[in-house]
Amino acid sequence: HASRATDGKKRRKRRKESYGIYIYKVLKQVHPDTGISSRAMSIMNSFVNDVFERIAGEASRLAQYNKKSTISSREVQTAVRLLLPGELAKHAVSEGTKAVTKYTTSK
């Protein structure tokens, strides 16, 4: 049985999903002339994944406590209020509300 490498068949590289393009777009909005190294991008990607998992976990717990089987924008908003400190939570909630409104009206 020949190994994959010597088989002549190209082994398709598994596409790794990341928030890279979105992080880059936000960077260009705030600092148009600033670049980002791949190491810094990797750190930012880990950060976004970490915050996403924390919010999702907290929202999941909130839904369970209230005997609900669905996470709604309300659970996510409460999770954000619990996880983020003061002013950061305020801004995150207003941006989230704005995004949900934009999504609802575009449907």
From Swiss-Prot:
InterPro entries: Histone-fold (IPR009072), Histone_H2A/H2B/H3 (IPR007125), Histone_H2B (IPR000558), HISTONE_H2B_site (IPR055333). Its main location: nucleus. Glycans are attached at S94. CDD domains: HFD_H2B. It is found in: Nucleus; Chromosome. One of its GO terms (molecular function) is DNA binding. The keyword Chloroplast does not apply. Monoubiquitination gives a specific tag for epigenetic transcriptional activation and is also prerequisite for histone H3 'Lys-4' and 'Lys-79' methylation. GO terms for cellular component: nucleosome; nucleus. Pfam families: Histone. There is a cross-link at K102 (Glycyl lysine isopeptide (Lys-Gly) (interchain with G-Cter in ubiquitin)). Keywords: Chromosome, DNA-binding, Glycoprotein, Isopeptide bond, Nucleosome core, Nucleus, Ubl conjugation. It comes from the Eukaryota. Core component of nucleosome. Nucleosomes wrap and compact DNA into chromatin, limiting DNA accessibility to the cellular machineries which require DNA as a template. Histones thereby play a central role in transcription regulation, DNA repair, DNA replication and chromosomal stability. DNA accessibility is regulated via a complex set of post-translational modifications of histones, also called histone code, and nucleosome remodeling. Belongs to the histone H2B family. PANTHER family: HISTONE H2B (PTHR23428). The nucleosome is a histone octamer containing two molecules each of H2A, H2B, H3 and H4 assembled in one H3-H4 heterotetramer and two H2A-H2B heterodimers. The octamer wraps approximately 147 bp of DNA. This is Late histone H2B.L4. It comes from Strongylocentrotus purpuratus. The lineage of its organism: Eukaryota, Metazoa, Echinodermata, Eleutherozoa, Echinozoa.
